[in-house]
Amino acid sequence: MAAPGGARRRPLLLLLFAGLVHGASAVFVVKNGNGTACIMADFSATFLTSYDTRSGPQNKSFELPAGAEVSNSSSCGKENASDSSLVITFGRGHTLTLIFTRNATRYEVQLMRFAYNLSDTDTFPNSSSTGVKTVESATDIKADINKTYRCVSETQVNMDNVTVTLRDAAIQAYLSSSNFSREETRCEQDLPTPTTPPQPAPTPAPASPAVFRYNVSGSNGTCLLASMGLQLNVTYRRVDNKTVTREFNVNPNKTTFGGNCSATLATLELHSENLLLLALQFVMNESSSRVFLQGVQLNLTLPDAKEGSFTATNSSLRALQATAGNSYKCNAEQRLRVTSSFSLNMFRVWLQAFRVDGDKFGPVEECQLDENSMLIPIAVGGALAGLVLIVLLAYLIGRKRSHAGYQTI
């Protein structure tokens, strides 16, 4: 792997089934003109893209290959300037760029940019477009100065019609030595969830919520169709100043729903006695024809809360993505982190926003969790079949040799 001033790669140890599901991890190093490392990154990455073909939109998932290299366009920044960058190239004209910035106490990946070459017919067969397309997004990757950003859990960065998933990541910029710091700043996904002291009569966790079919209609017909079970996971401070985490199922039998529609915005609103408002806001990106959940708003009455209620809002999500006209489906439980104190747990999701034909769902786009759950048994089955074949061949060869040893006299 080439890098300014040189770069190194660590030996790779691939496990049989892990190698079948996820790509290999690699160490990427950027050095300054004196040969001193200023950026080090060690992670594996998966890219999930949607591109247009003559027969319609097509999803493509691929890994960052072991042969990926650090580009000479990577930079440590000029003198003590805060901006520096790691540019990774792979395949036929694909690049992943991490742009860093810092202040006196912390540094972060301010921007992640992915440029992919639609002329690469091996990666994007039957693409109706050619040339390089570039997407970018801010990230939550940040750490204290002189500490390594560490995240064993998956970290997803959504960029228009591309989702980049990093795994087992160790990243450090503005290095004080040529190695990762032993001190780490862990990502929020790796931190233990808040726990509460044992209570005399703890509230049991609720069972999976009931699945219900919701719909929202406007002047042009149905704009949102959803079948799902919803569960609220909230962390709050009680009147006794103890912090607790509780889960609440949304009971369809005690909930009313409504919403509104526009050309590029569809909102589902749920109300009940304690659930003053749960709003899910879906948007359509007209340039990419991608539909996704962008906003979640919660207003919940909690009698034992110190504030008497709980509120949370996030209007910058990019979840539950699908192509306009298609439906999104996920049988696996999904935990959507809305804020640090609120997660929306979703069960057996099947939904479609925009271009809904009456009360029927369009062509299905499966979620990544469902696709991964199918890959593992296929990989295990293939390995077992290969093992059985080897044993059978060994048996037949041994039997043939034993017969050859008994010749008629």
Curated annotation (Swiss-Prot):
What are the UniProt keywords, alphabetically?
Cell membrane, Disulfide bond, Endosome, Glycoprotein, Lysosome, Membrane, Signal, Transmembrane, Transmembrane helix
Q: How does it assemble?
A: Interacts with ABCB9; this interaction strongly stabilizes ABCB9 and protects ABCB9 against lysosomal degradation. Interacts with FURIN. Interacts with TMEM175; inhibiting the proton channel activity of TMEM175.
Q: Which Pfam families match?
A: Lamp2-like_luminal (PF01299), Lamp2_2nd (PF21222)
Q: Which organism is it from?
A: Bos taurus
What stretches pass through the bilayer?
A: 375-398
The segment annotated First lumenal domain runs over: 26-187
Coiled-coil intervals, chain numbering? none
Question: What residue spans carry the region label Hinge?
Answer: 188-219
Q: Which residues lie on this side of the membrane: Cytoplasmic?
A: 399-409
Q: Where is this region: Second lumenal domain?
A: 220-374
One annotated Gene Ontology cellular component of this protein = caveola
Question: Gene for this protein?
Answer: LAMP1
Residue ranges under compositional bias (Pro residues)?
Answer: 194-207
Per the UniProt record, the lineage of the source organism begins with: Eukaryota, Metazoa, Chordata, Craniata, Vertebrata
Where it sits in the cell: the answer is: Lysosome membrane; Endosome membrane; Late endosome membrane; Cell membrane
Annotated region Disordered: the residues are 180-207
Q: Which residues lie on this side of the membrane: Lumenal?
A: 26-374
Purpose of the protein: Lysosomal membrane glycoprotein which plays an important role in lysosome biogenesis, lysosomal pH regulation, autophagy and cholesterol homeostasis. Acts as an important regulator of lysosomal lumen pH regulation by acting as a direct inhibitor of the proton channel TMEM175, facilitating lysosomal acidification for optimal hydrolase activity. Also plays an important role in NK-cells cytotoxicity. Mechanistically, participates in cytotoxic granule movement to the cell surface and perforin trafficking to the lytic granule.
Per its record, how is this protein called by name?
Lysosome-associated membrane glycoprotein 1
Coarse class of the primary localization is membrane
Q: Name one GO molecular function term.
A: ion channel inhibitor activity
